[in-house]
Amino acid sequence: ELQTRGLGMAVEVWDETGESVSGTKGELVCRAPFPSMPIGFWADEDGSRYRAAYFERFPGVWCHGDYAELTATGGMIIYGRSDAVLNPGGVRIGTAEIYRQVEKLDEVVESIAVGQDWADDVRVVLCVRLRHGVELTDELQERIRREIRRNTTPRHVPAKIIAVADIPRTISGKIVELAVRDVIHGRRVANTDALANPEALEYFRDRPELAVD
C-alpha cells in the first residue's frame, strides 16, 4: 500500500460512471494537470494518440489505466492495469493481487496472469518463470494455488498453471498481459515493436494445456 497520494496532485479513484469512490476498486485518475504530465507523443501531430491514451476514458480527465483503491487511511493500493483485469464469474480481479502471492515462493522468478475465454466465462491462466533447475510439479502447482487461496479468494485461484522460459516485456520493463492474452487466443499482436523481447510471445502460442476442445 502506498502511504499517500502524490503530493500536490488531484488523484482520485473513479467508478465506471465517473464518480469518486473510496474503499472500492476503480480507475486511478488525476483531475488537474501535474508537473510530470507529458504534453504529447512524438510524431503525433494532431494529438489524437495522446488524447486516446490518457483522456478518452473520462473526457478531459487524465486516466492512464491503473486499477486502484483509495483506502480509509488515505493510502493507495494498485491492483494492476485496468485493461488487464481478470473477470472470472463476473468478479473483477487485478493481476497484481495474484502476482503478490505467487512471487512469494522461492521457486518463482516472475509470473503473468491472463483471462482465457472458456465455456461462456473466463478462466484464469497463470504462467510462471521458474528458477533454473526447478520443474513445475503437481506439488509446486498445489503450493501456488494454496498460497493464492489463503491470501485472496477462491476466484483468484488459476484454473491452469503453466511454465514458460520467458515473459514478454515492453522496452520500459513492464510485462504485457494483453499481448499474451492475444497470443493464447490466436489473435495477432498489434505492436510488437514496443516489446523488448517479442520472441518470448512464442512460449505462449499453441500450448496444448490451453487447447479449447
Language model features: what each stretch is:
Residues 12, 161-164:
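General small-molecule cofactor/ligand-binding pocket signal
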Residues 4-8, 17-55, 93, 188-189, ...:
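Conserved ATP/PPi-binding loop(s) of AMP-dependent carboxylate-activating enzymes
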Residues 13-15, 30-32, 128-130:
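Flexible glycine-/small-residue-rich
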Residues 5-8, 204-213:
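Acidic, glycine/GT-rich loop-and beta-edge segments that sit at the periphery of enzyme/chaperone cores
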Residues 34, 39, 48-52, 60, ...:
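AMP-binding/adenylate-forming catalytic core of the ANL superfamily
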Residues 10-11, 27, 75, 172:
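Conserved beta-strand and immediately adjacent loop positions that scaffold enzyme active sites
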Residues 14-17, 110-112:
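Glycine-rich, charged/polar anion/phosphate-binding loops
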